[in-house]
Amino acid sequence: MDNYGSTNFNFSKRRFEHPNGENNNRKFLQISKVAYEYFWRDFDEWENKGFPTLNLSKVELAHFSENVIWVGHSTALLNHKGITVLTDPHFTGRAGPFGFMGPKRITSPPFLIEDLPKIDIILISHNHYDHLDKQTIIHLIKLQPEIKFFVPLGLSDILKSFGVKNIVELDWWQSFKHKNIIIHATQVQHWSRRSFFDRNKTLWSGWMMSWDDFSFYFAGDTGYSNDFAKTAKRCGSPTLAAIPIGAYEPREFMKAAHMNPEEAVKAFQDLNTKYAFGIHWGTFKLTLELMDEPPIRLRECLSEAGVPQRKFKCLVHGEQWGDPFGTCN
């Protein structure tokens, strides 16, 4: 195991670690109880229907510009000043190591991989199967082999095994200049694992992309911490942020790794972002809250915090949102 010279690597534990320590150790009985509840909930026909999708054609996507589209879960498509960015691309039917294993997708993507416009940059937050999907990546690079991937420390090896050649690997708070954009890897409170034997052997991160007149923050997957305030202090406040709002119950089990809507609003405020949209909900049934609860709770929390609904939106799958880009025209 290579520590990559990172100060975020715990030598005694032989793994990466957040400054707040590890919080993802769970006892067998805890896991068994949640698994039991999840198993029976999976038979709920209403929740398996998914959500409405605004389907987009290849022709429509060919003219995609100065806009963001929520594709689903943590996948978003963004364009600014001719640069098109895709986050945590996932277009397959399950989030797992095989096509028959892992949480099933309940809301279909709004378009096919083949319909995507030219992608310049892909941001990967970490190696969990609902964020790093092998079949999606393989399909993408067959169609567009020149895409540049930005990944946290340790993920380049697995991407190379998928056939990816153009990779930039960064530690927390490191940055890379791509054309006229500064791309920062930011610290977030989460963890990594892709098998039984590799817990936290690779890093996880959020991402800040900074143009001269616009910035985009992708939180990836994270619990609430002071990382958002740190990010704003180090990288500046973003124009637009993609903030996770789902997969948070049971709270005692998920709190360290996943924010609930109340915490998502706090993150919005800590970042001092102008706009945000919710991700990590409504696509895969991952945890025990009702599938439609995150956007309902988010709207309530925004009202309580005095944040206008138009500033922090829950987009429909496939919905385009151009308002944040009008601030830089």
Model-derived features with residue positions:
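Metallo-beta-lactamase
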Residues: 1-104, 109-115, 152-218, 239-246, 297-319, 324-325, ...
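Catalytic core of the metallo-beta-lactamase
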Residues: 77-81, 177-238, 255-263
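Histidine-centered active-site/metal-ligand motif
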Residues: 73, 126-131, 190-192, 218, ...
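Conserved G/P- and acidic residue-centered "switch" motifs that form tight phosphate/ATP-binding loops
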Residues: 88, 126, 221
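Cap/insert and terminal regions of metallo-dependent hydrolase folds
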Residues: 4-19, 113-116, 121, 128, ...
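Active-site HxH/HxHxD metal-binding segment of metal-dependent hydrolases
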Residues: 91-99, 107-175, 186-187
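Glycine/Thr-rich phosphate-binding loops of Rossmann-like dinucleotide-binding domains
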Residues: 95, 132, 193, 251, ...
